[in-house]
């Protein structure tokens, strides 16, 4: 159906183009609906909607993803095989025939200029015969191919355009730098160009929102020429300048939004938590290990923030196993000592229980009360191993009365169910700690921050906003930290505890798999345990319809398949368990508990193991389909082993023969810290690797611009200049509207 939609669209436009151009001399506004543009019918309005385009402005901001350079116009006798060019000639003949042995139709045309003739062939595009009428002057653009036997040159599926009369000056698809757009079924780049070209000539360009001094200082092109040249550039250089302007604009708006949030946060009230230095010294002295210098520095930065009268907003970043949790826990104990409460939210029940157990074990004499609240239950721990299992309502009442100072939990801390069960309300919540903050939405975090000072009929200006500390093991490249989290302060733990041994990491070839299995068997015989990570849960359902090569490229072994293989064929005498996100919480808890107690030898799992799981006796990380993961994620997987006294190993398996993939995996084996891998990931895979699977709402252009450190720094500098001068943006009303609108759509998670 694709060519049917396209053909009807093109035929309609071809026959009505002059009318469309004449009609559109009446000025269109940027916010005019597409339905107001004559020549675009309901069917194509719907196609544009599928691309998120509803207005003229949204269409003009639907930027090309790349360009085809057909600007080299040559004689037919001058063309060379494989080299992109445009030829102009007269159609001498056109025919349609069914291809031999193939279920398709061929349209063939012969075009002639004063230097020679050339044949053009289109496959399954029979509508083209209506355009390629004998005697018409046309442009053909593409890279010519040579016939196998005769060596004669011809065009295969070239771009074409009728250029008789005045049309030659308005070429859109040939003889120029041609834009290629994001498309949808039934709406091609050719169709999009047909619509954009006349609109560009008739639209009223809005007022420039970037201040003149910023435009001048950063050498930015104006809005009107930028719109024209990003769609129909005279050169690739023109296109790059226009793209730079729009990329800068998106980053500039983002930074204004984030810096505005930062300025607003400073005006909020928070509980001042005076840190008892003697208590802190006593707590750290009682730890079974010494804090690293990085941990001490991070703890000092956090303590300093908490002692202020406005809310802390800090990200604590460090490699897996670097000791972030103990730093956050010490901050929570210090808050409790001042009579305040701390909420500690984790993304999974497994991790929440782990944090709860760590707090109990590390601070056994803490008598302020440590509660665990998850979807499957609740309990409270007081000093000297006095632990009470209670129903959630009882635990909630204790928290609301202030009888529990540290509350660890999952989404259950903020849950509001159909039964009427609400999340927890705290009496004096002063500190919120969120582990792996990018796994929670902005609204979820806001709900937790709102669990504090809610009573007494206080206005928002009178309320006390909790200090906010987020933790992440995801290494964040400097470019992203500048661009996406300029509203946060950063603390980085750059050292690993001295008792951590280096992990021997190897990229394993398929022929070495039996030896790797034997190695695992030997390690388990010595009392150790192993993780096996697979990217997918379910196997493909239509394997029989795929070739071996397609299976080889597309199917990563599922957890269930791997579990069956390992438990029945490879390690039949060992205890193998399986863990994935579709299991019930109670089942996952039992599996992890058994693995932690060494009742299970091998745990086959999905990427859930990436987040926080701590089993010191596990010494082998076995990653299937390693090429399917980002470098930083592989580094985090590796950090799940090497936490005990025994030497640990990480095996990276890939069935791919690609040298590039092998090179990427070897970089993980050689890496000494996650940050250098994160920088590589940003260049190779883009910012989506760090922002997670959930859409941020950020424009594609801004996402791509995040790979340009220099442009990010320029935009941040410009935003700071404007915010410092006019914090409320009152002098720039249109810019202020744009920033507010941007904030409604974009969320950094």
Spans of features found by a protein language model:
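C-terminal helicase module of SF1/SF2 nucleic-acid helicases/translocases
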Residues: 512-528, 554, 558-749
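Conserved pre-motif I regulatory segment
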Residues: 273-315
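Conserved helix-turn-beta segment of the N-terminal RecA-like "Helicase ATP-binding" lobe
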Residues: 352-386
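Post-DEXD/H (motif II) to motif III coupling segment of the RecA-like Helicase ATP-binding lobe
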Residues: 353, 426-431, 438-451, 459-504, ...
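Conserved SF1/SF2 helicase motif Ia
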Residues: 331-356, 368
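Conserved motor-coupling elements within RecA-like helicase/translocase cores
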Residues: 378-407, 424-426, 585-601
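Upstream accessory/linker segments immediately N-terminal to the RecA-like ATPase cores of bacterial MutS
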Residues: 97-286
């Amino acid at each position: 159906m694709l060519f049917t939609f396209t053909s009807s669209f093109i035929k309609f436009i071809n026959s009505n183009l002059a009318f469309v151009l004449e009609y559109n001399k009446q000025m269109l506004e940027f916010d005019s609906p597409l339905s107001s543009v004559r020549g675009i019918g309901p069917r194509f309005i719907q196609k544009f909607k599928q691309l998120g385009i509803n207005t003229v402005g949204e269409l003009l901001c639907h930027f090309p993803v790349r360009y085809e350079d057909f600007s080299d116009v040559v004689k037919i006798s001058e063309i060379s095989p494989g080299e992109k060019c445009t030829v102009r000639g007269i159609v001498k003949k056109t025919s349609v025939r069914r291809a031999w042995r193939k279920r398709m139709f061929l349209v063939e045309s012969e075009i002639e200029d004063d230097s020679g003739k050339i044949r053009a062939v289109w496959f399954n595009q029979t509508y083209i015969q209506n355009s390629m009428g004998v005697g018409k002057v046309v442009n053909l653009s593409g890279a010519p191919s040579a016939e196998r036997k005769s060596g004669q040159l011809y065009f295969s599926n070239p771009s074409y355009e009728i250029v008789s009369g005045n049309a030659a000056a308005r070429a859109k698809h040939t003889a120029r730098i041609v834009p290629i757009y994001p498309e949808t079924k039934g709406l091609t780049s050719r169709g999009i160009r047909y619509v954009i070209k006349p609109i560009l000539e008739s639209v009223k360009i809005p007022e420039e929102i970037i201040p003149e001094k910023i435009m001048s200082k950063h050498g930015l092109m104006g809005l009107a020429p930028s719109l024209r040249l990003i769609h129909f550039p005279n050169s690739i250089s023109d296109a790059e300048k226009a793209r730079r302007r729009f990329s800068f604009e998106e980053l500039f708006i983002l930074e204004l939004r984030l810096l505005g949030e930062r300025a607003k946060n400073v005006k909020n009230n928070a509980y001042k938590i005076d840190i008892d230095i003697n208590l802190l010294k006593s707590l750290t002295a009682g730890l079974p290990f010494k804090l690293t210098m990085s941990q001490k520095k991070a703890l000092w930065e956090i303590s300093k923030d908490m002692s202020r009268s406005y809310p802390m907003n800090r990200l604590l970043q460090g490699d897996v196993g670097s000791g972030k949790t103990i730093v956050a826990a010490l901050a929570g104990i210090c808050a409790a000592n001042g009579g305040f409460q701390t909420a500690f939210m984790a993304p999974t029940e497994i991790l929440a229980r782990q944090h709860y157990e760590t707090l109990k074990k590390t601070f056994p004499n803490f008598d302020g009360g440590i509660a665990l609240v998850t979807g499957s239950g609740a309990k409270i721990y007081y000093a000297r191993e006095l632990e009470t299992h209670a129903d959630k309502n009882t635990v909630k009442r204790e928290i609301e009365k202030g009888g529990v100072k540290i509350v660890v939990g999952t989404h259950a801390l903020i849950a509001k169910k159909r039964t009427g069960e609400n999340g927890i309300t705290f009496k004096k919540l002063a500190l919120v700690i969120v582990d792996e903050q990018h796994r929670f939405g902005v609204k979820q975090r806001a709900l937790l921050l709102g669990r504090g000072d809610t009573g007494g009929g206080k206005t928002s200006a009178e309320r006390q906003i909790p200090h906010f500390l987020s933790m992440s093991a995801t290494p964040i490249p400097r470019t992203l930290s500048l661009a996406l989290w300029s509203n946060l302060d950063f603390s980085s733990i750059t050292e690993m505890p001295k008792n951590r041994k280096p992990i021997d990491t190897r990229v394993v070839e398929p022929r070495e798999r039996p030896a790797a299995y034997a190695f695992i068997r030997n390690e388990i015989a010595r009392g150790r345990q192993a993780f096996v990570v697979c990217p997918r849960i379910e196997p493909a359902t239509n394997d029989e319809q795929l070739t071996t090569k397609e299976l080889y490229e597309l199917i990563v072994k599922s957890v269930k398949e791997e579990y069956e293989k390992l438990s029945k064929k490879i390690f039949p005498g060992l205890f193998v368990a399986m863990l994935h996100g579709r299991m019930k919480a109670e089942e996952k808890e039992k599996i992890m508990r058994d693995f932690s107690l060494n009742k299970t030898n091998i745990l086959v799992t999905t990427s859930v193991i990436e987040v926080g799981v701590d089993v010191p006796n596990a010494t082998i990380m076995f990653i299937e389909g390693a090429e399917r993961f980002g470098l930083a994620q592989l580094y985090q997987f590796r950090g799940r082993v090497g936490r005990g006294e025994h030497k640990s190993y990480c095996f990276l398996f890939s069935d791919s023969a690609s040298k590039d993939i092998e090179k990427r995996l070897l970089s993980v084996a050689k890496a000494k810290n996650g940050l250098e891998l994160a920088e590589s990931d940003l260049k190779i895979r883009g910012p989506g690797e760090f922002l997670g699977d959930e859409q941020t709402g950020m424009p594609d252009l801004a996402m791509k611009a995040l790979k340009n450190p220099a442009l990010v720094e320029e935009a941040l500098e410009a935003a700071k200049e404007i915010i410092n001068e006019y914090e409320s943006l009152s002098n720039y009303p249109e810019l202020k509207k744009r920033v507010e609108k941007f904030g409604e759509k974009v969320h950094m998670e």
